[in-house]
C-alpha cells in the first residue's frame, strides 16, 4: 500500500448538487494535470515511468499526470473555470495557505484514482525531487468522494476482468498495478493510503458476484521481505470465508511486481501469479521457517507456534487437513497428536486469545523461555516472533480486518 499523508477535509451536510460539482472539479483538474505531463517541466515525471519499463500506451491507459511548480497553478486554473475555492477544498484539490488558496500537490507525478463509474475522485502523488520535504507518497485527503478505506487504484481498468475471471490480484503500489497490467494480468488493484481492509474486500466480492459464499480467488502479492510477512499475517487475520479462497504470490529476491517485470520480463510476472500458494499454507510455512526443524527442539518450538495458527482456521475439514500437513512439515511422527492439539487449541474460549495478542504487542526481544507446555502460547520474548508480533500490532490497529 501507499503511505498516507494528509488530513481530513471531508465535506458534511452537502448542498444538493455538491457531489456533481466535486466530480466536475476533479475531472477538470485531472485534464489539467494530464496536459502538464507533456510539458518540458514534467520530463522527470515522464522519465520516472519510462525508466520503469512503461510504454506510452500504458501511461496513457492509466491517465497519469503531473502537478506543476508554483503554489497555486492548478487552483487558479480551476477558479478561472468558475469553481469556488470552497468546492476545490472540499474536493481535496486545494487548501488554504498562509497567503491564500494553494494547490495540494506540487511537482509530483500523479495517478488518478477513480470510482467504479470511472469518475476521478482523487489522486495519488509521488515525490520526484530531493528538495521536496513531504512524504514519498501522498494521497488526496478524505472527502465526500474519496474514502481511502473503500477506494482501490486500478479498479476502473480491472473491474470487468475481475468480474469475468472471478479473480483479483492485490498489490502494494501504483507502479505494481501498472506492471501487472502491462504484463497481461488485468485484474490487479492496490489500496490507496491505507492497508487493504474489510471494505476493500466487500468491493471485490460484489464485483465477483458473490452474495452468499466467496467462490473467487483473491491473490495477494507480497514482497519477500519482513514487510511482506506482516502484510500476509494481517490478511490471514481477516474474514475466514474469504481467506480460505485467498492465495499468496511472493516475488523472488524481495522484488515487487514492478521490479520483477523490469528485471525479468512480462512472463515472470505472469508466472508469479500462476505459482500462487494458498494463504493458509504460506502463513504456516512462514512460521515454521523461523525454526530449525532439523533439531528436536526446533520441531517442538515450531509446533508450539504453528498449532495456534492452524486452530484459527474456522473451516473444520480444512483445519484437519492443515493439522496433518503441519505434522509432515515439521517432521512430527504422529499426525493424530497434532490434530488433537489443534482441536484443543480451537476449543479455547476466544476471550483467552486477546491477552496473547496484547502480550505480543508489549513484548521485548529476549531469549526464548524453554519451560513451556506443549500448546501454551509462545513466549513474547522469543526474538524470532518479531514479524508476527508486528503483524498483530497492525491487526489491533485495524480491527475491521480482524476476524
Name each model feature, range by range.
Residues 6-11, 40-51, 59-64, 86-93, ...:
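Short coil/turn segments at secondary-structure boundaries
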Residues 12-14, 33-38, 62-67, 102, ...:
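Conserved short loop/turn motifs at secondary-structure junctions
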Residues 11-28, 47, 69-214, 232, ...:
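Phosphate-handling DNA/RNA-contact segment within nucleic-acid enzymes
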Residues 14-19, 26-60:
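Non-catalytic interaction/clamp surfaces of large macromolecular machines
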Residues 115-116, 159-167, 197-403:
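A charged alpha-helical hairpin associated with nucleic-acid processing machineries
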Residues 52-65, 184-195, 335:
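Short, well-structured beta-strand/strand-turn elements
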Residues 8-16, 31-33, 136-144, 288-293, ...:
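Short hinge/gating elements
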Residues 1:
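Conserved P-loop/Walker A NTP-binding site and adjacent catalytic elements of P-loop NTPases
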Amino acid at each position: 500500500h501507499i503511505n498516507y499523508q494528509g488530513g481530513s477535509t471531508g465535506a458534511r451536510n452537502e448542498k444538493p448538487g455538491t457531489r456533481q460539482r466535486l466530480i466536475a472539479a476533479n475531472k477538470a483538474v485531472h485534464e489539467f494535470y494530464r496536459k502538464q505531463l507533456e510539458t518540458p517541466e514534467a520530463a522527470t515525471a515522464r522519465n520516472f515511468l519510462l525508466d520503469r519499463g512503461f510504454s506510452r500506451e500504458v501511461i496513457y491507459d492509466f491517465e497519469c499526470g503531473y502537478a506543476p511548480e508554483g503554489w497555486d497553478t492548478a487552483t487558479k486554473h480551476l477558479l478561472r473555470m468558475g469553481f469556488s475555492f470552497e468546492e476545490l477544498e472540499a474536493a481535496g484539490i486545494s487548501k488554504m495557505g498562509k497567503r491564500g488558496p494553494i494547490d495540494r500537490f506540487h511537482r509530483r507525478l500523479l495517478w488518478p484514482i477513480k470510482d467504479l463509474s470511472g469518475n476521478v475522485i482523487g489522486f495519488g502523488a509521488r515525490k520526484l525531487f530531493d528538495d521536496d520535504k513531504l512524504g514519498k507518497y501522498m494521497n488526496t485527503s478524505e472527502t465526500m468522494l474519496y474514502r481511502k478505506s473503500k477506494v482501490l487504484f486500478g479498479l476502473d481498468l480491472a473491474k470487468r476482468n475481475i468480474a469475468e475471471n472471478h479473480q483479483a490480484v492485490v498489490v502494494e503500489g501504483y507502479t505494481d498495478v501498472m506492471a501487472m497490467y502491462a504484463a497481461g494480468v488485468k485484474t490487479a488493484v492496490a489500496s490507496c493510503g491505507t492497508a487493504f481492509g474489510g471494505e476493500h474486500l466487500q468491493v471485490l466480492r460484489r464485483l465477483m458476484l458473490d452474495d452468499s459464499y466467496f467462490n473467487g480467488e483473491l491473490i495477494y502479492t507480497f514482497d519477500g521481505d519482513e514487510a511482506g510477512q506482516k502484510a500476509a499475517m494481517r490478511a490471514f487475520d481477516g474474514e475466514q470465508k474469504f481467506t480460505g479462497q485467498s492465495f499468496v504470490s511472493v516475488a523472488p529476491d524481495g522484488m515487487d511486481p514492478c521490479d520483477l517485470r523490469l528485471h525479468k520480463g512480462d512472463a515472470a510476472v505472469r508466472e508469479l501469479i500462476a505459482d500462487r500458494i494458498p494463504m493458509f499454507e504460506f502463513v504456516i510455512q512462514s512460521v515454521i521457517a523461523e525454526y530449525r526443524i532439523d533439531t528436536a527442539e526446533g520441531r517442538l518450538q515450531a509446533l508450539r507456534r504453528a498449532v495456534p495458527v492452524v486452530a484459527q482456521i474456522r473451516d473444520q475439514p480444512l483445519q484437519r487437513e492443515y493439522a496433518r500437513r503441519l505434522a509432515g512439515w515439521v517432521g512430527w511422527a504422529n499426525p493424530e497428536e497434532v490434530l488433537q492439539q489443534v482441536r484443543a487449541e480451537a476449543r479455547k474460549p476466544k476471550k483467552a486469545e486477546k491477552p496473547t495478542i496484547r502480550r505480543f504487542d508489549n513484548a521485548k526481544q529476549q531469549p526464548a523461555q524453554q519451560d513451556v507446555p506443549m500448546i501454551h502460547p509462545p513466549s513474547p520474548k522469543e526474538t524470532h516472533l518479531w514479524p508476527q508480533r508486528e503483524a498483530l500490532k497492525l491487526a489491533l490497529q485495524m480491527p475491521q480486518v480482524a476476524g
